[in-house]
């Protein structure tokens, strides 16, 4: 759909995604390792530890998002210039496009961290359908319809692509919070049951 704004916009969006990957790839790496740890502890009945792992992961992912936002905000013009430079040619228009798109997209770094931590917990507890729902919603509910709206009902230019990415990434984090709250309530119930059983056995 971004092709509506021209081939150069598609290229700029690809570069913007690559720049975003400097931060979000850390989230992905944490997700893979943490989901396995959460699953192992859940299998051992150590529900309190799974909750602790999730909270630590959430804190780390949010810090990564904040750090990424600060660093990329400071270095975005330079990063864009690197990607806009070929062997014998520098394209200032392409560089400006990259900056225009990513200055919006990067505002979702923190909420993507929240989304990543939530997915780790859901995968660790075997909530694969909820995980799929969040991933599908991010693209087909929060991204495609938003870009379609901008293209049909506004005069916004290629900057709409960056705003769409921002909306999609922020909504992904908000929806993850909405999904994870009832899951956390269930885990807390299991912890209380575990502690009650332990006290009964001690008696």
List each model region and its residues.
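Small-residue-rich hydrophobic transmembrane alpha-helices
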Residues: 12-76, 112-131
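Short alpha-helical transmembrane segments in multi-pass integral membrane proteins
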Residues: 38-108, 151-203
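Hydrophobic/aromatic end-of-helix segments at the C-terminal termini of transmembrane alpha-helices
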Residues: 1-6, 34, 75-79
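Hydrophobic alpha-helical transmembrane segments of integral membrane proteins
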Residues: 139, 143-157
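Alpha-helical transmembrane segments of multipass membrane proteins
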Residues: 1, 22, 117-121, 144-149
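Short runs within selected transmembrane alpha-helices of multi-pass transporters and secretion channels
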Residues: 27-32, 105-124, 130-139, 146, ...
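Interfacial/gating helices of multi-pass transporter permease domains
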Residues: 2-21, 90-99, 127, 161-163
């Amino acid at each position: 759909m971004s092709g509506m704004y021209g081939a150069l916009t598609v290229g700029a969006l690809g570069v913007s995604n690559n720049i975003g990957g400097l931060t979000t790839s850390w989230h992905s790496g944490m997700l893979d390792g943490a989901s396995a740890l959460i699953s192992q502890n859940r299998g051992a009945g150590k529900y309190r530890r799974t909750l602790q792992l999730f909270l630590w992961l959430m804190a780390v992912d949010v810090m990564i998002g904040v750090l990424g936002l600060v660093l990329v905000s400071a270095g975005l013009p330079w990063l864009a210039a690197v990607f806009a430079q070929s062997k014998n040619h520098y394209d200032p228009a392409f560089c400006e496009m990259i900056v225009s798109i990513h200055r919006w997209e990067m505002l979702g770094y923190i909420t993507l961290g929240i989304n990543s931590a939530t997915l780790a917990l859901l995968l660790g507890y075997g909530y694969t359908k909820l995980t799929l729902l969040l991933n599908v919603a991010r693209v087909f509910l929060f991204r495609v319809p938003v870009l379609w709206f901008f293209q049909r009902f506004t005069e916004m230019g290629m900057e709409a692509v960056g705003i769409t990415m921002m909306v999609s990434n922020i909504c992904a984090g908000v929806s993850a919070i909405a999904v994870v709250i009832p899951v956390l309530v269930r885990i807390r119930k299991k912890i209380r049951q575990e502690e009650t059983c332990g006290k009964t056995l001690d008696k």
